[in-house]
C-alpha cells in the first residue's frame, strides 16, 4: 500500500511539474491584461470615430449652407422725378411803332395804381418829361414786383420799356427757360439671404441745386462703382469662408486616417 502511494505521488509530480502550473497562471494574467487593453483601445477608437463623424457632419452642413455666391448684377431702375410744371411765361412783346397804343397801355397801368381814368391823364401827360417819368416808373415797378412761385430758383421775366429817338416806345420781355427735371436712379442689389437692398440717388442737372438724398451729391457712376466694390469684397469673404471649411474637412479626414493607422499598429503589435 505504501508502495502504491509513493508510485502515485511520483507519477503525479513527473506528469504535472510545478513550473507548468505557475506558467499557466502567469499566461492567464497576460491574456486578461491584453484583453483589457484591447477593449480600452476599441472603446477609444469608437469614441474618436464618433466625435470625428459628428464634426464632419457639422462641417458638411456649414459648407452646404455657405456655397460660393455667383456675382450678382445690380438692377438699375431710372424713374424721372415729378416736378411742378412752371407757369407759362408771357410771350415777348413785339416792338411796336404805334406810339398811341404803347401810351394807352402805360396810361392804363398808371390809372390802375392811381385809381383815375386814363382819359383824364392823356391831355395832361403829353410833354416828353412826363413820358420819361412814366417809363421809368413802369420799369422800376417791373423790377421790384415779384410773383410768388413754388420754385425759388426760377427767375421771372421782366418787361422793360424804352423810348426811341423818334418818340416811339418799345417794350421787350426776355424768354426764361424752365429748369430741367432732375434724374433719379434706384439701384437694387439682391443679398445672399434672399432679400433686396435698394439705394436711390438723384442727379440734378442744375449745378446750384442741393441733393435731396444723403449721398452728398454722389454721381451715379460713383455710386455704381461703390456698389460693385462692395459686391467684390463680399464675394472674396465668402470664398475665404468656403476655403476654410474645405481645409477643415481635409484636416478631419487626415486625422481619421492617422487614428486608423494607429489602431492597425496596435493590432499588429498584439499579434
Swiss-Prot record:
Disulfide cross-links: none
Biased composition (Polar residues): 92-101
Induction notes from the record: Expressed in the late phase of the viral replicative cycle.
Keywords: Host membrane, Late protein, Membrane, Virion
Superkingdom to which the source organism belongs: Viruses
GO cellular component, one term: membrane
Biased composition (Low complexity): 144-165
Region Disordered, annotated ranges: 80-101, 140-180
Chief site of localization: virion
InterPro entries given in the database record: Poxvirus_A4L (IPR010396)
UniProt PTM comment: Its phosphorylation state is regulated by the OPG054 kinase and the OPG106 phosphatase.
Keyword Membrane in record: yes
Keyword Metal-binding: no
Subcellular location: Virion; Host endoplasmic reticulum-Golgi intermediate compartment membrane
Function: Component of the virion core. Participates in virion assembly.
Similarity-based family: Belongs to the orthopoxvirus OPG130 family.
Binding partners and assembly: Interacts with OPG136 and its cleaved form.
Protein name in the entry: 39kDa core protein OPG130
Species for this entry: Variola virus (isolate Human/India/Ind3/1967) (VARV)
